[in-house]
């Protein structure tokens, strides 16, 4: 479902007369271990939709890359109106990326960009060394939290989340 959201954002942007691109980066690991595999599998669809997937060397570098996408319009020669971006990772990655989240969120998003952050929490510590509930880390970084409860809401809140990110400037 996550890889289907990117083309929908770009299609909505095109309908509004915008030429945007997408960027996805994060770090593999359970409970999101299959997301990057699905993104690689959908690479042709994503490429055709103007969405680049770049797996991160680690969570923090992935978050820093996301931050950079929101600065694209600060440089001459940019070919898009904005870049909408998705970071993904699990609880320890959220912890590791705190500085990039705080500074990226404080810097804001580009007018036609936007950032969503997807955290795969392991509340029962089934596949992680420590249990996680990332909402508190996001609150600490002053990042709004959306909590979809099913796939339909994941897609709908993803679309609305990018619109909210653009409007508010928040990640």
Residue ranges and their predicted role:
Residues 1-158:
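Thiamine diphosphate
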Residues 151-171:
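Internal alpha/beta core interface subdomains
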